[in-house]
């Protein structure tokens, strides 16, 4: 395979990756923590869009526990979206023998 062909493949992959990345960043992902006790919607660019807390969890005496659950749910949602992004990038990049 010629260097020119490889360079063109890389440019095409870069364009395709950029296009898919922009679409991914605007996509909303819903994450349900503990069977929907806390629902988090996060965008692909990791912007937190919404948090919905089951009213059963809202009790002033359990404030610390609720805060810990929100942090854990948010971190799990971010991790999930990062994994989906990594999978998207991996699928987009071309497989050039001997290059990577």
UniProtKB/Swiss-Prot annotation:
Pfam families named among the record's database cross-references: YbaB_DNA_bd
InterPro entries: YbaB-like_sf (IPR036894), YbaB/EbfC (IPR004401)
Gene3D superfamilies according to UniProt: Nucleoid-associated protein YbaB-like domain
Entry GO MF terms: DNA binding
NCBIfam families: DNA_YbaB_EbfC (TIGR00103)
Protein name per Swiss-Prot or TrEMBL: Uncharacterized protein MG134
